[in-house]
Each structure stands twice: as C-alpha cells, then as structure tokens.
Amino acid sequence: MSDSGDAQPQDGGNSSSSRGKSPSVGNRVTVVLGAQWGDEGKGKVVDLLAQDADMVCRCQGGNNAGHTVVVDSVEYDFHLLPSGIINPKVTAFIGNGVVIHLPGLFEEAEKNVRKGKGLEGWESRLIISDRAHIVFDFHQAVDGVQEQERQQQAGKNLGTTKKGIGPVYSAKAARSGLRICDLLADFQEFSERFKHLASQYKSMYPSLEIDVDGELEKLKSYVDRIKPMVRDGVFFMYEALHGDPKRILVEGANAALLDIDFGTYPFVTSSNCTVGGVCTGLGMPPQNVGEVYGVVKAYTTRVGIGAFPTEQSNETGELLQTRGKEVGVTTGRKRRCGWLDLVLIKYAHMINGFTALALTKLDILDVLPEIKVGVAYKVNGETIPHFPANQEVLQKVEVEYETLPGWSTDTSAVRTFEELPENAKKYVCFIEDRLGVPVKWIGVGKSRESMIQLF
C-alpha cells in the first residue's frame, strides 16, 4: 500500500497495457462458397487448396451436400466429411452448424476407404464440435413424409434430399434437438429426451414408424467411436486461429441461392450457406475471415423445382446436361440447365463479398457456336436493379442477354490462360468486367491438373 492509502498506478491510472490496442486477429480462414444453386465444383477448388492446408472445416449443412473429388484416377464422394480430409496432413473439423447423421458419417468414410488410399486413418484426423446437432433416422423418415404431404396438398414438393436436414434444423430452432454433447453425457437422460422427441413426431405424423429402442441401441454403439473425435468446438477453433500460423480452409456446402435467408425461398436448404454461416457455424469472429472464393459454373444448373430465369428447356439445355453429365451426386436426379446468369452471381457477391472466383466447366461450352449470358432482369418491361425475393416475381422476369461468340475448340488439354482460344478468354474477361471480381481459376476438366490458375 502507498502512504496515501490509495494505491495509484504509476502511469496516472492507465494500468491496462492493452487498452487502446486492437487484439491480434490471428490466423485468417479461406472460404470456398457456391455462388449459384450448388453443384458448381466447390469440391475441386477445396481439393486444390487443401493440398497446402493444415485444417479444413465444414460449417453448415449435413449429408445433403455432394462433393466429388478425383485423386489418382479414383473418384471419392463426400457428403458430410470435409473433402479436404483426403489430404493425410489435414485436420478435418465438423463445426457446430453442421447436422450429423452418425450412420451416414461412418458409411461414407468406409465407402471411400474401400475406393483408395486417400482416407486411410481418417478417424484420427477428424474433429467434431460437441455442439453439432444429431440427425436421427426418424428425421429422415419425417423428411419423406413431409415431402409426400406437400405433393398431395400443393401438387409440388421442395425436392429435398430426404436426408432429414429440414426436420433436424426445425428441431434445433424449436429447441427440442439433441447434440453430440448430449449423446456423450448421461445416456439415460439422452434416451429420455430422444423418446420424447420421437413421440412428438409420432403425434404429428401418425403413419410414422420409429424403432425407438433399435435406434437408441445403434446410437449407443457410436459413443465410444466418436468420443475421441469430439472437442469443445469454440475452444478448438480459437486455439487454431490464435496458435501457430495455420492455413485454414472452410468448405461451404450447398450455395448462395439455396441459403435459408437469401436463397430462392422456399426452394432452399435449411442452413446459411453464405459467408455469415461460417462465423455462426464454426464459432469464430468475422475479422478472421480472409479470402472468400465464389465458385461459379460457366453455365447455370439447378436440381428440383423453383424459378430458374435462364433455364433452357430445349436442345441447348439438353446439350449442357449431357456434355456436363449434370446428375446430382446425392439424389441422382438430372439437373436443369441454362445460360450463365450474372444477375444471380452479382446478388451472391453482394452477400458474400467474393475476393475472387473459380469458373468451372468452361470446356462444356466448347462446342457452342455462340454463348448467351444473362445480364439483367426486366419486370413489366422495366429493368430491375435487384434480385427478386418473391418466387412468383422471379418466375415472371424477362432476362436480357448478351450474346458472345463461341470458340468451337477443345479446351480440355489447356493448362494456361494464354493457351485458351481468344473467344474463351473474352468470355472470362466479360464475366470479370461485369461482376468486378477477378477470376482466379478456370476449370476445363475433372482432374486436379485441369484447373488453370490465373494469379
């Protein structure tokens, strides 16, 4: 104590050495997001970036997503696992925003292990957030029943993947969901809550058949297998961001136009697949978001129903579908195809703030004599400056196109921008100029080598 009886700091009261200084930001994450309706080739971009990454994360969605990665001529399919796990040096993290169907997780891993060496030792490389919600078999059954009801009542369904994603996110919002941390705590308490949730669904859908004891038995069998993988996700992420320098990659599932808030509602998924979902789905602040790469297919595709302004229900659409082998990885459904829509991508950019783009499947356009690009929407003859929220309005928009000359040259063997045909270069530059975002990669084939890097 000082003589005055008042212990005063020597610097006149400014005792905090950190006051007025911003705390250090730490490592920044690189984010890869779909800029259209999904199936843009995000897995390929992630696979490319994962070669140098230390950590690859999933922040939202469940096994409704489908990513295909080709390594050493082996085609691996990922739905729930971050596809970067294919790199043996990578730690894969499934964040709290992801919903996990445990049988699906292990089936997916085992299926890929049988295909090739890429996934050997995956269990020691996977970390799961304790706050992630669990998808139960009955969520998947409910998904199917809800689709049937929608079909009967309105004559149209949402085209869900029937993986239980909507029902589990609904349960999460209604605060009746169960999480990984609940499964690993008191199993008796977990069982009670599980039974209560099952009975709620039974009362809503009397035709629903739920094998409560069978499913609980199955869930109990996963406890010891997943326990070593589970961590407090927030603490784990904080340590990763503020520890040694690390290259951290976030692999977005689904895409901007499927986002629950910003997508073509109601024909959307049940999570935020735009950049905001990265922070809420991993438990990290926005200042740790670094590069945000938007993945754009050189034309547009969509699975299921919903407005699609540039859709080509004609020979062009069929050509794109056939040449692009446009069939869903998760559903096996044929994708609807149409011209590139820059109104839609500009909208996705407004939300996500893309720092660069990956333009995929350019080679699919190789045979077209001319290529159209949607550049504006008109409603009642008036150009509108925004992307309509209302589905009925979006159904009615008239698309204004710019027609560009094709290049009628096979680009699949091209490995540098300079080697591309002149008109293909012009197509890329046209996209960059209209969006004000640089194209960093151009995809001209399935393999890793067929991604041309521009800078």
Curated annotation (Swiss-Prot):
GO terms for biological process: 'de novo' AMP biosynthetic process; IMP metabolic process. Inhibited competitively by AMP and IMP and non-competitively by fructose 1,6-bisphosphate. Mg(2+) binds at residues 39, 66. Pathway: Purine metabolism; AMP biosynthesis via de novo pathway; AMP from IMP: step 1/2. One of its GO terms (molecular function) is adenylosuccinate synthase activity. GTP binds at residues 38-44, 66-68, 335, 361-363, 443-446. Its cofactor is Mg(2+). It is an enzyme of class 6 (ligase). It catalyses: IMP + L-aspartate + GTP = N(6)-(1,2-dicarboxyethyl)-AMP + GDP + phosphate + 2 H(+). The keyword Mitochondrion applies. IMP binds at residues 39-42, 64-67, 161, 175, 254, 269, 333. One of its GO terms (cellular component) is cytoplasm. Plays an important role in the de novo pathway and in the salvage pathway of purine nucleotide biosynthesis. Catalyzes the first committed step in the biosynthesis of AMP from IMP. Its EC number is 6.3.4.4. This is Adenylosuccinate synthetase isozyme 2.
